[in-house]
Each structure stands twice: as structure tokens, then as C-alpha cells.
Amino acid sequence: MMRGFENIAGIESVSGADDSGEVQKLQITEKAAGSGFMARVLDKVSRLFAFGFTSVPPLGSEVLMLRLGGDRNCSIAISTNHRPSRPKGLQPGDSAMYDVRGIMIKMTADGLEISAAGLPIVIHNASKLTLDIPEVECT
């Protein structure tokens, strides 16, 4: 039974990405599977996203693959993880958006924290910027 599951889903490695089209395509390096499959590279694997969020995973990221009907030629990428970049120490209920450079927007019980990792912040195409706050502190 477990062998059959290995043919339906698996954790593989991202070895390339093309974000130029309507659907992001990944190059995936698959390790050998338990049913006699050899390790191989798959090109142009579609990656699915939740609406409103997008990213390009760093090379070497883990990717959860779903193989439709157990066919490795009919694979889609449904989730990615890059362990070295993942923020640690969040509490239950916290959320964060982050990138490989250390830029992070963290939402916690104490409030919203934005870290630009020493890089500039640019706001484009705004008709107005309103700060509805009692105090601004610059350090």
C-alpha cells in the first residue's frame, strides 16, 4: 500500500523555474521511487498557487508532487518549502510572508512587523498615502 502512495505523491527537488507564462513551470529532479523508477528530471511541471500569492522557489527547494493516476509524466507541484529561508519561532496563530533575502512581513499577537533586510522600500502608483497613527518614531 505504501509503495502505491509513493507513486501518487512524493517530495522532490526544484532544479529550475520559468515564471514567464500564465502558469509557472518548474523543472523537478525526482529521486528514484520504490517501484523500480530511476531518478530523473521532469521539465515544465505546472505549479499551483493559492490566489493572490506567488513566488519562485529557490533552487534546491523541496516540492510536493502529486502524480495524477500514479503517472510520473502527469505530475503537478502543489507545495514548496525552502528550509534555510523559513522563519522559525512563530507562535500559534502567527503568519509570515518572507523571501530568500530575509525580507519578511510578520503578523503576530503583538502587531505587524516588516523587515526590509536593509533594502529600500518603494511604493508605486499610489494616489495618496495616509498614516492614521498618533505618533511616528524615526531612529
Question: What function would you assign to each model-found segment?
Answer:
Residues 85-139:
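Parallel beta-helix/beta-solenoid repeats that form elongated, surface-exposed shafts/blades used
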Residues 1-109:
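Exposed beta-strand/loop interface patches that mediate assembly or binding
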